[in-house]
From Swiss-Prot:
The active site is at 2 (schiff-base intermediate with dna), 3 (proton donor), 57 (proton donor), 259 (proton donor). This is Formamidopyrimidine-DNA glycosylase. One of its GO terms (biological process) is base-excision repair. Keywords: DNA damage, DNA repair, DNA-binding, Glycosidase, Hydrolase, Lyase, Metal-binding, Multifunctional enzyme, Zinc, Zinc-finger. It comes from Salmonella arizonae (strain ATCC BAA-731 / CDC346-86 / RSK2980). DNA binds at residues 90, 109, 150. SMART domains: Fapy_DNA_glyco, H2TH. It comes from the Bacteria. Its EC number is 3.2.2.23, 4.2.99.18.
């Protein structure tokens, strides 16, 4: 599933081609996504794009009379095309722009979403979200406060959007490795120093992935059709049985809430 770095990479890739241009029309080939494509999107015509923003794993296209909310789901990606190209099986949505560009949404598993709202505030998919991990609000003090009475393992707690948004399976595993914290540790057992370190490394890991265009393991592509290259830098995720890059101990795989977790027994305590 695309996580925060992949969504932010998509935002940065499409923004220069959309902002200041006008949506001539939308071409919906298959509107049966996780939720049906909103009727308002079908009716788009001569609509300027004012901004392209991100909240958690949602892309937000600001229009004069409302917002398009895009979620990439499990396998979605957005590409900018310079000219019309024949659509393939999983190309479900096109936004045809006045500058000759086409924003194409591809989603083999159709777990993504294209929604419309007049106002962002209070929309159900954006309500009850925690802070952005790259914001000043997310820091060691905040993390310690939220972990203090939490009797659950730290790995699934990091993936809870009520705590912090956008830290999915890949980056939770990678951040815990970078901080030397075992994923099974109770959140409440983390010291102030460990919370400070973990908050810092989460930011560092996410920023490094954004610099590399995100992580492509299967479906994700950047807006220019290229894969993300952070997969080459993964320390533990997806490396079950391979030697730890630090100590050589085989990487272990386990599960938390049916999600794979990877860690090093020697480096993480």
């Amino acid at each position: 599933m695309p996580e925060l770095p992949e969504v932010e990479t998509s935002r940065r890739g499409i923004e220069p081609h959309l902002v200041g241009a006008t949506i001539l029309h939308a071409h919906i080939r298959n509107g049966r996504l996780r939720w049906p494509v909103s009727d308002e999107i079908y009716r788009l015509s001569d609509t300027p794009v004012l901004s392209v923003q991100r909240r958690a794993k949602y892309l937000l296209l600001e229009l004069p009379d409302g917002w398009i909310i895009i979620h990439l789901g499990m396998s979605g990606s957005l590409r900018i095309l310079s000219e019309a190209q024949p659509a393939e099986k999983h190309d479900h949505v096109d936004l045809v722009m006045s500058n000759g560009k086409i924003l194409r949404y591809t989603d083999p598993r159709r777990f993504g979403a294209w929604l419309w709202t007049k106002e962002l505030e209070g929309h159900n998919v954006l309500a009850h979200l925690g802070p952005e991990p790259l914001s000043d609000e997310f820091n060691g003090e905040y993390l310690q406060q939220k972990c203090a009475k939490r009797k659950t393992a730290i790995k699934p707690w990091l993936m809870d959007n009520k705590l912090v948004v956008g830290v999915g399976n890949i980056y939770a595993s990678e951040s815990l490795f970078a901080a030397g914290i075992h994923p099974d540790r109770l959140a409440s057992s983390l010291s102030k120093e460990e919370c400070d370190l973990l908050a810092r490394v989460i930011k560092a890991v996410l920023l490094r992935s954004i610099e590399q265009g995100g992580t492509t393991l299967k479906d994700f592509l950047q807006s220019d059709g290229k894969p993300g290259y952070f997969a080459q830098e993964l320390q533990v995720y997806g490396r079950k049985g391979e030697p730890c890059r630090v100590c050589g101990t085989p990487v272990v795989a386990t599960k938390h809430a049916q999600r794979a977790t990877f860690y090093c027994r020697h480096c993480q305590k």
